[in-house]
């Protein structure tokens, strides 16, 4: 081999090594950037989102205040009122539920925020939302308190529930037999 050939091979080797090192550096930068983006996403999603959501009283998924979520509730009540139900083959032959007159007797309606039921008011302040429809309570809204466990629900929600079940939706305690 001549010295020109050695120089050409040496130049090609150096250029190949430089390209290889450049690609390795680019790959490391790409991996580090991806890791940084992932860390930022986790911080925002797991740490800041719940904090900002409760402090600003915003639902970050749809960008509205919680009091403006009536569309979801109307849809839920529409589904209940139309009677759409999935078949329950275990109870097909035996009807377990209460008539509206029995529900009215066992669980009288109460208005939220009236102060005439202090213990119930404390429960509603603890939960701040109906466990059935997941909507918050509004002042002067009709609610019912489950007599056994004192859980509070919207009247329409618990009425629909009690027409098919004889237990509390939250803790599954049975209604008193009377």
UniProtKB/Swiss-Prot annotation:
Q: Which coarse location class describes where this protein primarily resides?
A: membrane
Asked if Zinc-finger is a keyword of the record, the answer is yes
Which pathway does this polypeptide act in?
Protein modification; protein ubiquitination
The membrane spanning regions, by residue number, are 11-31
Q: Where in the cell is it found?
A: Membrane
Q: Which reaction does it catalyse?
A: S-ubiquitinyl-[E2 ubiquitin-conjugating enzyme]-L-cysteine + [acceptor protein]-L-lysine = [E2 ubiquitin-conjugating enzyme]-L-cysteine + N(6)-ubiquitinyl-[acceptor protein]-L-lysine
Write out the entry's keywords from A to Z: Membrane, Metal-binding, Transferase, Transmembrane, Transmembrane helix, Ubl conjugation pathway, Zinc, Zinc-finger
BP-aspect Gene Ontology terms: protein ubiquitination
Q: Where are the zinc fingers (RING-type)?
A: 130-172
Supply one GO molecular-function term. Answer: transferase activity
Query: Is this entry keyworded Oxidoreductase?
Result: no
List the Gene3D superfamilies. Answer: Zinc/RING finger domain, C3HC4 (zinc finger) (3.30.40.10)
One Pfam family, short name:
zf-RING_2
Q: What is its EC number?
A: 2.3.2.27
- What cellular component GO annotations does this protein have? membrane
> How would you describe this protein's topology in the membrane?
Single-pass membrane protein
Q: What is known of its domains?
A: The RING-type zinc finger domain mediates binding to an E2 ubiquitin-conjugating enzyme.
Family named by the database record: Belongs to the RING-type zinc finger family. ATL subfamily.
The name of this protein is Putative RING-H2 finger protein ATL19
């Amino acid at each position: 081999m001549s010295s020109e050939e050695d120089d050409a091979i040496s130049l090609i080797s150096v250029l190949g090594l430089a390209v290889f090192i450049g690609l390795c550096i680019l790959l490391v930068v790409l991996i580090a950037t991806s890791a940084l983006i992932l860390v930022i996403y986790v911080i925002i999603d797991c740490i800041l989102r719940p904090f900002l959501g409760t402090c600003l009283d915003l639902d970050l998924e749809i960008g509205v205040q919680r009091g403006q979520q009536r569309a979801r509730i109307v849809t839920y009540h529409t589904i209940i009122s139309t009677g759409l139900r999935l078949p329950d083959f275990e109870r097909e032959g035996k009807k377990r539920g209460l008539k509206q007159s029995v529900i009215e007797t066992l669980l009288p309606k109460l208005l939220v925020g009236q102060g005439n039921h202090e213990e119930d008011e404390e429960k509603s302040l603890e939960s701040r939302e109906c466990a059935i429809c997941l909507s918050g309570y509004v002042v002067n809204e009709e609610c019912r308190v489950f007599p056994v466990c004192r859980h509070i629900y919207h009247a329409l929600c618990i009425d629909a529930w009690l027409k098919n079940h004889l237990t509390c939706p939250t803790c599954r305690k049975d209604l008193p037999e009377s």
